[in-house]
Amino acid sequence: MELFQAKDHYILQQGERALWCSRRDGGLQLRPATDLLLAWNPICLGLVEGVIGKIQLHSDLPWWLILIRQKALVGKLPGDHEVCKVTKIAVLSLSEMEPQDLELELCKKHHFGINKPEKIIPSPDDSKFLLKTFTHIKSNVSAPNKKKVKESKEKEKLERRLLEELLKMFMDSESFYYSLTYDLTNSVQRQSTGERDGRPLWQKVDDRFFWNKYMIQDLTEIGTPDVDFWIIPMIQGFVQIEELVVNYTESSDDEKSSPETPPQESTCVDDIHPRFLVALISRRSRHRAGMRYKRRGVDKNGNVANYVETEQLIHVHNHTLSFVQTRGSVPVFWSQVGYRYNPRPRLDRSEKETVAYFCAHFEEQLNIYKKQVIINLVDQAGREKIIGDAYLKQVLLFNNSHLTYVSFDFHEHCRGMKFENVQTLTDAIYDIILDMKWCWVDEAGVICKQEGIFRVNCMDCLDRTNVVQAAIARVVMEQQLKKLGVMPPEQPLPVKCNRIYQIMWANNGDSISRQYAGTAALKGDFTRTGERKLAGVMKDGVNSANRYYLNRFKDAYRQAVIDLMQGIPVTEDLYSIFTKEKEHEALHKENQRSHQELISQLLQSYMKLLLPDDEKFHGGWALIDCDPSLIDATHRDVDVLLLLSNSAYYVAYYDDEVDKVNQYQRLSLENLEKIEIGPEPTLFGKPKFSCMRLHYRYKEASGYFHTLRAVMRNPEEDGKDTLQCIAEMLQITKQAMGSDLPIIEKKLERKSSKPHEDIIGIRSQNQGSLAQGKNFLMSKFSSLNQKVKQTKSNVNIGNLRKLGNFTKPEMKVNFLKPNLKVNLWKSDSSLETMENTGVMDKVQAESDGDMSSDNDSYHSDEFLTNSKSDEDRQLANSLESVGPIDYVLPSCGIIASAPRLGSRSQSLSSTDSSVHAPSEITVAHGSGLGKGQESPLKKSPSAGDVHILTGFAKPMDIYCHRFVQDAQNKVTHLSETRSVSQQASQERNQMTNQVSNETQSESTEQTPSRPSQLDVSLSATGPQFLSVEPAHSVASQKTPTSASSMLELETGLHVTPSPSESSSSRAVSPFAKIRSSMVQVASITQAGLTHGINFAVSKVQKSPPEPEIINQVQQNELKKMFIQCQTRIIQI
């Protein structure tokens, strides 16, 4: 259609129709095409594709008209319906301001012989000049003063920034789609119910997904049939349409294409191979729309953030099959403060205040989709636990039989980048998938309908959600194709079809992620290729950091634009964003200057923790370990800290999930054989990085090495200079010991190291990062490496040979929290048959009142590096002979005990692992016990009597009263009878009082805080209590629901977690402790339900500050909820 500019109007005309847009008040009206003759000096500006609507960026500013400048054909849906994507828009100010360069395609009728638009419209410089002149005239006419001039400039700047975000929203993300003949807002099933509806397309759309409804409101209110032509319903989301050929003899062409660019289909395909059309349509709800940290949870209307309906269409011959899934934020009132990296989620309203809005959300969902299968992927421990517990509690309160709640801890099951373990979920809910069916339509009508829907969510409903939705949709598609005879019954999808299908879902995840978080989806490489690769891990780190950066000062503008598009008043003071932006820029510059200092402090903190007092610190570097053999073959590309002392080097590993160092190795320099530096080993393509391989011996055996590389900020660098500098430092240090260390430059062989031995694990009792988040570190590491590189040429290596003069720097480090627990992995075959010869007595001191779990500041852990007292040395000497592998690490007061097999830390995957269980190590913390006082817990259990060891911690929130944090706070012996249990409860109360009294007496004497005495209590007869262990880690355990767990269910006894589980840094919900493959609490007999309830309720412990009666009421309330619950609860 043609766009004309007149004195008072912009006129859109096609054929006999014309739409006049007023440049005075922004009004829209329909007029005949012949009225163009009445316009004052109309000029044709070019061609446009359609009208999106109009928007007012500020109440004091004019309206803007948004037009489709350029579109791209996505494909054709069944019925030959074309689907188009908006690629470029044009924005016109509905005012007297002259339009700037619109770059429109020229109309051949009015611009015959003119190819360049600048010949008929002013140049950009002229437009800017006119704009400035017009603004200047306006300000002069209104008799300005300084205040008004400043306000005018701020309004212009604000309008400019919002307009910039509007253009980026439409053109950068390419996330708006439309069809002139097909209803993209409704699924095939919903469309099939109203096939005979004669209303125009825009009146039949689903209001939830009609994204430009408010912007085009002037036209929808006209009410005449003539307006139908101008209204184009749009969706925000994703659409991709592909035709696949089922050919099992065709190669996948993996070597000829990258994951981002699928191989081209052959132009000539045999007719004997069946074809089918696959379409993926994602529709984002316009209700509670917005950006990641600006929109979370539910609102007062029951709408949730990031709600997306995804439909997968399969079309074969005349048959169309549809399967629909949804995603959406957890429907409770929660938020995350987005101005810090990886902010901690928090609940904004109480449980009772949330119930009504939770019910409103699911009542609407059940009304639309009939049944709901909730798949909750949030972590059942750690910082996400508070949201998962709130979700489960609301489900129990909602108590609807049409709801099914499935909990799947994605990070726990897929730890170590084993994302293929998602099949565990699809296998567990396979029957539910088949029972849900799908919509099947042919020319005659509806054959069957989908009965229910999967509602998948994680915290952001992005990365994890997309992987799981793709897995479920694939199961459904394979069943559909087999029903239609396109696929053989026992054959999987052909490799080439599978690859294109994976790319479609990966693109879907990227598009939704860009709309909500501003960057592409993490884990997208797994969705594309089915495996996790090095490039994907590194890209995830960059994208995660980008999300944080974007949120700092861009999300506020984008959120304001989205709200204005939907007619929602902007509540945030947009003018204050300018100040925030300046503050951020200043802070960013300051952070750049202090990168070196931050990394230095981080290295110093771990140096103080890991290095003994008799070793001297020589240097530390931030690197990446490329060797896949740490713990198991799935650990790749782990961020590490390499610390060098005068006699050893330490490799400290970062955990992706908890964002802190949780394990390290100490390797003697005497065992360091050689260093190799060269290009990284690759199968295809040119190596991008240089790597350093440190070869070492273990028990006189070779074949062990670490492959490390530097993280460089500049992609053009390979980090070789940094690695050479590190290698020279290692060489000099070893030469100072009287031995030489060869440095060899060569192309590294593609091989794996032998499994590393003696890996020591560090776990923090408190929540939060130990120093900084992993991805924050990645952005800092390159600064350190760059610093090393720059100083290399200025350092005289010869002067560094006398390394005996290095002293451990005295620096106060406030990164570490004092409560630490450590696990030691021992790769010793004797551990497999060894008895559990002792149980560690744990003493946990009260935390300082000012230490919050959501605080960025950390108290120093100075006692770890202070010199030991004589009493401590005597205690250490007395404990060194505790057991065959029990020993003391005198450098930091760590006491090791015998191993306990089947610990949680070994549950790396669902498959068997050759790695042995860690020994339990407890780090002493100042307990306040006087020198002459004996710990009340200093007793050894015997077979004749039962005693309870309690170590309560302060609850993090209200749900800690109801969902016990027994995995990190409490160790409880079991009683075999109820009478004995009551007696043990009395003993526990007396013991707690004794600890309190001794603490008071010690505070009166003002004894300084120092490490407490820890005694290791041994039991020659092994454990005297039941425990729930992972099935794969205990040899005698035949099935997931074996002796211990079944006995517990039958007797109703309390279950004591294993020491390693109790020392975990993640607070685990009660359902996370169920280690069976699946537990269902519903739709079973009353007796079986009672057993299940007793199991769940047994996990609800009491907190010491709570009165006995309150805890009993809470326990009874939870038990009653489970008894009356009609919702099926499934834990996988």
Swiss-Prot record:
MF annotations from Gene Ontology: inositol monophosphate 4-phosphatase activity; phosphatidylinositol phosphate 4-phosphatase activity; phosphatidylinositol phosphate 5-phosphatase activity; phosphatidylinositol-4-phosphate phosphatase activity; protein homodimerization activity
Record region (Disordered): 846-875, 923-942, 974-1017
Annotated positions of the Phosphoserine modification: 827, 830, 878, 881, 907, 910, 1103
Biased composition (Basic and acidic residues): 856-874
Domain hSac2, chain residue ranges per copy: 593-760
Keyword field: Coated pit, Endosome, Hydrolase, Membrane, Phosphoprotein
GO cellular component annotations of the record: axon; clathrin-coated endocytic vesicle; clathrin-coated pit; dendrite; early endosome; early endosome membrane; intracellular membrane-bounded organelle; neuronal cell body
Highest taxon above the source species: Eukaryota
Source organism of this protein record: Homo sapiens (Human)
Function: Inositol 4-phosphatase which mainly acts on phosphatidylinositol 4-phosphate. May be functionally linked to OCRL, which converts phosphatidylinositol 4,5-bisphosphate to phosphatidylinositol, for a sequential dephosphorylation of phosphatidylinositol 4,5-bisphosphate at the 5 and 4 position of inositol, thus playing an important role in the endocytic recycling. Regulator of TF:TFRC and integrins recycling pathway, is also involved in cell migration mechanisms. Modulates AKT/GSK3B pathway by decreasing AKT and GSK3B phosphorylation.
Coiled coil: none
Official protein name in the record: Phosphatidylinositide phosphatase SAC2
Gene assigned in the entry: INPP5F
Domain SAC per the UniProt entry, residue ranges: 167-518
Record's subcellular location: Membrane, Clathrin-coated pit; Early endosome; Recycling endosome
Subunit structure: Homodimer. Interacts with OCRL and RAB5A. Interacts with INPP5B and INPP4A. Interacts with STAT3; the interaction is independent of STAT3 'Tyr-705' phosphorylation status.
